[in-house]
């Protein structure tokens, strides 16, 4: 039986394994699950936290032998540097997601960006985007 992988670990793994620091001013952010990163001083480094926002599970598709899971995972990017550096980080995340949107060697069927929110501090002390991704995967039921 194929088991649906953890969606948050899937996204953090993709970011860590495919990040090209040359696209972000030769800097690689700290990337991790929100529960692994814990409290981190956002004023000192680039940071990407990933966490699950919601998920659904449809049981019994295709003659009751296939389950489909759909999750929304947030990719929370922040930097104290500048808005242009944040845009570079955002561009790199999108590049990776487009590269891996449909990957036959992955634990998911489809990964796509859904929405983005600008949560930049109004005093411009730190710059932040939250990008929501939708991840779909299937599990074979025996």
Please name every model-derived segment.
Residues 57-60, 78-83, 138-142:
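Short, cysteine-centered beta-strand-loop-beta hairpins and adjacent loop/turn segments enriched
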Residues 65-81, 127-138:
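Oligomerization/assembly interface segments of phage tail-like spikes and tubes
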Residues 21, 94-142:
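Acidic-leaning, charged glycine-interspersed low-complexity segments
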Residues 67-70, 78-98:
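Extracellular/virion structural assembly segments
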Residues 61-67, 121-124:
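Short, solvent-exposed beta-strand/turn "edge" segments of beta-rich domains on protein surfaces
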Residues 1-63, 100:
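Small/polar-rich, solvent-exposed N-terminal microdomains that initiate assembly or binding
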Residues 20-30, 76-88:
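N-terminal short leaders/motifs
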């Amino acid at each position: 039986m194929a088991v649906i992988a953890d969606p948050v670990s899937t996204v953090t793994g993709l970011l860590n394994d495919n990040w090209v620091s040359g696209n972000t001013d030769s800097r690689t952010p700290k990337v991790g699950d929100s529960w692994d990163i814990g409290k981190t001083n956002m004023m000192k480094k680039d940071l990407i936290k990933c966490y699950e926002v919601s998920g659904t599970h449809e049981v019994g598709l295709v003659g009751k032998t296939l389950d489909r899971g759909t999750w929304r995972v947030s990719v929370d990017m922040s930097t104290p540097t500048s808005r242009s550096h944040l845009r570079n980080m955002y561009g790199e995340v999108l590049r990776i997601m487009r590269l891996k949107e449909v990957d036959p060697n992955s634990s998911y069927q489809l990964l796509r960006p859904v929405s983005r929110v600008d949560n930049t501090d109004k005093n411009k002390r730190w710059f932040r985007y939250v990008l929501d991704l939708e991840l779909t995967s299937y599990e074979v039921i025996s």
